[in-house]
């Protein structure tokens, strides 16, 4: 059994998961099936990865009950102003809720995208709200203007890099850090 963390809204999130960045749809589907068979219970995807539908197929093929799987995905910046963007991810994933949905980048009208997440959270379509790759003035703007503080930030974090300023700015609202490149990457 994998260890979980508790988010500030009491949602349980697995400590370890598998990401589907740079996977083709076929690779993502099989990776999800294999990861779930090995005991992983968190799967991360994004609209920009263009494999949400494949992740949903992998979840269904796995035979693991949906309520035992934690799915996170991200709204891409070009979709922040698009009506129905959360619902499109729900449809592609083949699920009636998403455990954690992120704003993928602090670009464009990211506050419009964040407001969509707040609305979806209130409607029960998503269980937690996340931000990805935020720091500095854009992070400050988001924290100043949002109604619901983010539950998770996904950011680069590993033994060679730790953004203490961003982590400290989010600590008062109980925001958890989710690392991408948690072990670093090939150029270190």
Explain the meaning of each model-derived region.
Residues 1-69, 83, 183-186:
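N-terminal binding-site loop/beta-alpha segment at the start of enzyme catalytic domains
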Residues 2-5, 53, 59, 85-89, ...:
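Alpha-helical scaffolding within the catalytic cores
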Residues 18, 35, 43, 55, ...:
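Conserved, mostly hydrophobic/aromatic
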Residues 23-36, 79-94, 110-112, 137-141, ...:
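Short, acidic/polar
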Residues 40, 95-98, 126, 150:
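A structural motif
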Residues 66-79, 99-106, 133:
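A short, structured active-site edge motif that brings together acidic residues
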Residues 82-103, 119-123:
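CE4/NodB-like, metal-dependent polysaccharide N-deacetylase domain
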Residues 105-188:
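Beta/alpha (TIM)-barrel catalytic core signal, keyed to glycine-rich beta->alpha loops juxtaposed to Asp/Glu
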């Amino acid at each position: 059994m994998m260890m979980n963390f508790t988010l500030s809204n009491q949602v349980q999130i697995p400590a370890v998961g598998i990401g589907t960045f740079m996977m083709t749809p076929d690779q993502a589907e099989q990776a999800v099936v294999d990861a779930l068979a090995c005991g992983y219970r968190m799967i991360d995807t994004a609209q920009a990865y263009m494999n949400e539908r494949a992740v949903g197929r992998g979840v269904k093929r796995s035979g693991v009950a949906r309520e035992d799987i934690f799915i996170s995905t991200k709204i891409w910046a070009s979709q922040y102003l698009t009506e129905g963007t959360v619902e499109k991810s729900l449809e592609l994933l083949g699920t009636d809720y998403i455990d954690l949905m992120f704003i993928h980048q602090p670009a464009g009208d990211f506050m419009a995208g964040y407001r969509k997440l707040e609305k979806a959270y209130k409607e029960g379509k998503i269980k937690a709200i996340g931000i990805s790759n935020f720091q500095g003035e854009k992070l400050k703007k988001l924290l100043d203007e949002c109604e619901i503080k983010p539950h998770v930030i996904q950011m680069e974090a590993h033994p060679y890099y730790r953004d203490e300023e961003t982590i400290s700015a989010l600590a008062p609202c109980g925001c958890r850090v989710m690392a991408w490149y948690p072990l670093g990457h090939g150029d270190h």
